[in-house]
């Protein structure tokens, strides 16, 4: 329960950016991975590793930190990370670029891809390969388990515009407003069928009660035409027809 009277900024510093909190998030994802990644029951057994996930976190430093923790604590999961160039560079930018380069090296080595670092735009080439892999698009659509990527860690990248029916869950270690929240949740909502994937899942690690209200508000906004705030939705005339 985080109802401690601390501001969101204080919670970020004292709790959410702490190593024990992040270790607990990794442990929770690891503990529930088989359930969230398994497909429908086939001959009495759930097929493992049929679905992928995304972990959305607060800023580049958190992306790099979580990636390192997954490598240490959950090496059996195939995890990749990315962040965009236009996210706040701030202090430690060179360290963060080095962390991204190392993650790219890990990825290229594990999957035996070409060397993206030799491309004109290495980050774009890496992101393109990663999104194809997690969406199981050509050439990763043959059901070859060696091609499988389990989890992508992001800050802002891929929270809009990207979706895949194979992304079954988004884990949220960040607070989002209603508009961005609907966008992020929509990354998981492409269904397969009523048995394999009837709906996507979202798991919140920050202020569950607050986020529950935000989800309710976001759904009101969404049903009233996709405004960015609840106030905007309230100003939408109801007599406009469907």
Regions found by a protein language model. Give the residues of each.
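Conserved beta-strand -> loop -> alpha-helix junction used to position metal-binding or nucleic-acid-contacting
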Residues: 77-87, 183, 198-209
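Switch/connector loops and helix/strand junctions flanking conserved nucleotide-binding motifs
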Residues: 88-96, 162-163, 178-181, 191-198, ...
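A short beta-strand element within the Helicase C-terminal
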Residues: 150-154, 158-185, 200-204
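Short secondary-structure boundary/capping segments
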Residues: 69-74, 94-104, 168-170, 185-189, ...
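Long, hydrophobic alpha-helical segments
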Residues: 192-242
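Conserved C-terminal RecA-like helicase domain
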Residues: 6-151
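Secondary-structure transition/capping motifs at alpha-helix termini
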Residues: 36-40, 71-77, 143-146, 164, ...
């Amino acid at each position: 329960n985080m109802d401690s009277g601390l501001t969101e900024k204080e919670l970020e510093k004292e709790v959410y950016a702490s190593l024990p909190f992040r270790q607990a998030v990794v442990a929770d994802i690891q503990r529930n991975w088989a359930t969230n990644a398994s497909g429908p029951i086939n001959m009495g057994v759930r097929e493992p590793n049929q679905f992928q996930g995304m972990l959305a976190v607060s800023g580049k430093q958190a992306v790099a930190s979580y990636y390192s923790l997954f490598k240490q604590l959950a090496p059996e999961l195939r995890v990749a990370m990315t962040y965009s160039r236009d996210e706040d560079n701030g202090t430690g930018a060179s360290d963060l670029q080095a962390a991204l380069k190392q993650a790219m090296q890990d990825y290229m080595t594990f999957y035996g891809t070409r060397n993206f670092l030799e491309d004109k735009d290495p980050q774009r080439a890496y992101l393109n390969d990663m999104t194809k892999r997690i969406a199981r698009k050509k050439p990763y659509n043959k059901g070859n388990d060696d091609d499988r990527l389990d989890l992508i860690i992001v800050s802002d990248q891929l929270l809009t515009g990207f979706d895949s029916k194979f992304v079954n869950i988004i884990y949220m270690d960040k607070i989002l407003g209603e508009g961005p929240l609907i966008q992020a949740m929509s990354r998981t909502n492409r269904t397969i069928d009523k048995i394999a994937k009837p709906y996507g899942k979202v798991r919140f690690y920050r202020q569950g009660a607050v986020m529950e209200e935000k989800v309710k508000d976001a759904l009101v906004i969404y049903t009233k035409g996709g405004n960015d705030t609840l106030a905007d939705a309230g100003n939408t005339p109801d007599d406009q027809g469907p």
